[in-house]
Amino acid sequence: NVTARFHHPFVKVFEEERELTVMLLIDVSGSLDFGTTHQMKRDMATEIAATLAFSAIQNNDKIGVIFFSDRIEQYIAPKKGRKHILYIIREMLDFKPESKKTDLNAAIEFLTRVVKHPCTAFVLSDFYVRSDFQQVLQIANRKHDVIALQVYDPRAKELPDVGLMNVTDA
């Protein structure tokens, strides 16, 4: 016994090696190309995703990304390492989606189908969707820890009083 030999208590502290998988589901639809205060919603989502990604590598976790609109635009499988994170951030900054619409159901169903082991999934979106995604989210939440982060601009809810104006749906 170490305590008996050295005549003082010996405490060994174990640090858990978690190696979680973190998935970022990033909405790249046209509704994120809006911003009035300091930045576009797309830039805000990218900044949040980059912060989460760097936090994941600090914990030695794997990080993966699903870019989605009304379809899966791109999937980057979870991996570890700084090089992988920099690749993900470069993709986030340069990504050009094929569609402007949003289907959150498709993204969550893809997550449950592709990621086999339990993970922590962050959904970054403005959640301007036409379909109800609550049932699919509950199914995904049985297997994964799903966290929704809403990217929001206050002007999206309050239109300025400027009279008649032309509005185009993305």
Q: What are the language-model segments listed below?
A:
Residues 1-74, 78, 110, 120-123, ...:
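An amphipathic, basic-hydrophobic helix/alpha-beta surface used to engage anionic
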Residues 4-7, 103-105, 128-132, 147-149:
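Short amphipathic alpha-helical surface micro-motifs
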Residues 23-26, 48-51, 88-93, 146-150, ...:
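Glycine-rich loops and low-complexity Gly/Arg-rich segments
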Residues 80-81, 163:
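Short low-complexity, flexible loop/linker segments enriched in glycine and/or proline
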Residues 84-119, 131, 151-155:
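Von Willebrand factor
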Residues 113-117, 129, 135-170:
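Von Willebrand factor type A / integrin I
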